């Protein structure tokens, strides 16, 4: 069960709003999806995620297959009951994880052979097996197995990876259909092709011919300059059908997300808000700060006066810095709550602006605030 419809189009940009319908509820787009790789968003409960405004989260086929394993998840009839999450779930196929563990993996026509990073055991992910695994996980949106390549890459290598990704996508789609996928969930194809426009066009065209539920732009945020990333995303998004959701994988900063909304992207995921939170980097309406910096030691105000998250409505910067400097576990939870709330609601606000016909003004105000010196009109902290 998966449907998508567009509801509003921005007259000034390619931004749009829409609605995805899944077996576990509707998702308004554009949407930011917190990354819950191992059936958990680090330090947060499902109730925390709901409080942050999360409509849908992301799990990872590769990691969940290795630990805890499908046999354990089978006992709960899927990830939703296993982790206590009753809203939609998207699962990545594991292609990026195989790429990131390149020294432990080998790519063939059959699939991706790899050694477990946990115990060194040998495994093989094929297009068919990743669909079978995602069926057992109970995903609302499944992803095809793809081959991601590093930056920079020679054109021949990028072409080979994109062609293999397309062949794998066809096999994924066949397995998805054979196992009753269309009645349960959506399946997205992933456009590859490195940073080469013609390869991206060829990849997108052949995936569109296969007729997927939605399309993802993969192979970004692998070391390329931001300007290149946005240019490739813009070109690739322009090749995708308007009646299907468009998913930018693994990107990015708040400013990148605002620009990608303007380019017509509908879905985003990124570890940036959660990973940075654990290191003390917090995103705010006036820019990012490092809460560990000494200038926050006596600050009685919140991380962001404009934020209504649990952290900002209850605690001071001074207290949060104290938790980080003391290595208290609460620091990671409060910082993660704030960063995810900021990311999710940045996209929620962008969506509301598109729906109200004021996205251009929203975009301008976002950049004006990010360039400001801080909520009090002075630099919030040197080196932040």
From Swiss-Prot:
Listed Gene3D superfamilies: Queuine tRNA-ribosyltransferase-like (3.20.20.105)
Active site: residue positions: 92, 269
PANTHER family: QUEUINE TRNA-RIBOSYLTRANSFERASE
GO cellular component terms attached to this protein's record: cytosol
General function of this protein: Catalyzes the base-exchange of a guanine (G) residue with the queuine precursor 7-aminomethyl-7-deazaguanine (PreQ1) at position 34 (anticodon wobble position) in tRNAs with GU(N) anticodons (tRNA-Asp, -Asn, -His and -Tyr). Catalysis occurs through a double-displacement mechanism. The nucleophile active site attacks the C1' of nucleotide 34 to detach the guanine base from the RNA, forming a covalent enzyme-RNA intermediate. The proton acceptor active site deprotonates the incoming PreQ1, allowing a nucleophilic attack on the C1' of the ribose to form the product.
Assembly and binders: Homodimer. Within each dimer, one monomer is responsible for RNA recognition and catalysis, while the other monomer binds to the replacement base PreQ1.
Single Gene Ontology MF annotation: metal ion binding
SUPFAM superfamilies: tRNA-guanine transglycosylase
Record EC number: 2.4.2.29
Obligatory cofactor(s): Zn(2+)
Record-given protein name: Queuine tRNA-ribosyltransferase
């Amino acid at each position: 069960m998966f449907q998508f419809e567009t509801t509003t189009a921005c007259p000034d940009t390619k931004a749009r709003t829409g609605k995805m319908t899944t077996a576990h509820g509707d998702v308004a787009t554009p949407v930011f999806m917190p990354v819950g790789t191992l059936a958990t968003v680090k330090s947060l409960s499902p109730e925390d995620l709901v409080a942050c405004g999360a409509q849908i989260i992301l799990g990872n086929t590769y990691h969940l297959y290795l630990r805890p394993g499908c046999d354990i998840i089978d006992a709960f009839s899927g990830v939703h009951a296993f982790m206590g999450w009753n809203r939609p779930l998207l699962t990545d196929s594991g292609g990026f994880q195989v790429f990131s563990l390149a020294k432990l993996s080998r790519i063939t026509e059959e699939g991706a052979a790899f050694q477990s990073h946990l115990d060194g055991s040998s495994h093989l992910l094929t297009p068919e097996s990743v669909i079978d695994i995602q069926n057992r996980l109970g995903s609302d949106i499944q992803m095809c197995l793809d081959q991601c390549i590093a930056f920079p890459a020679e054109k021949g290598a990028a072409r080979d990876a994109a062609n293999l990704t397309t062949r794998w996508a066809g096999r994924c789609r066949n397995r998805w259909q054979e196992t009753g996928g269309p009645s349960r969930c959506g399946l997205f194809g992933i456009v590859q092709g490195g940073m080469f426009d013609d390869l991206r066009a060829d990849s997108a065209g052949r995936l569109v011919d296969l007729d997927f539920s939605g399309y993802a732009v993969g192979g970004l945020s692998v070391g390329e300059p931001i300007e290149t990333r946005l240019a490739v995303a813009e070109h690739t998004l322009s090749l995708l059908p308007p009646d299907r959701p468009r998913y930018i994988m693994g990107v990015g900063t708040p400013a990148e997300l605002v620009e990608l909304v303007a380019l017509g992207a509908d879905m985003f995921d990124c570890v940036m808000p959660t990973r940075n939170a654990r290191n003390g980097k917090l995103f705010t309406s006036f820019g990012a700060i490092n809460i560990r910096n000494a200038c926050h030691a006596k600050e009685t105000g919140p991380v962001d006066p404009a934020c209504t998250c649990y952290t900002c409505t209850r605690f001071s910067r001074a207290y949060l810095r104290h938790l980080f400097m003391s290595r208290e576990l609460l620091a990671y939870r409060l910082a993660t709550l704030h960063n995810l709330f900021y990311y999710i609601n940045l996209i929620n606000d962008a969506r509301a602006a598109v729906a109200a016909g004021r996205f251009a003004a929203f975009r301008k105000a976002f950049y004006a605030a990010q360039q400001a010196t801080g909520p009090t009109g002075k630099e919030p902290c040197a080196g932040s």
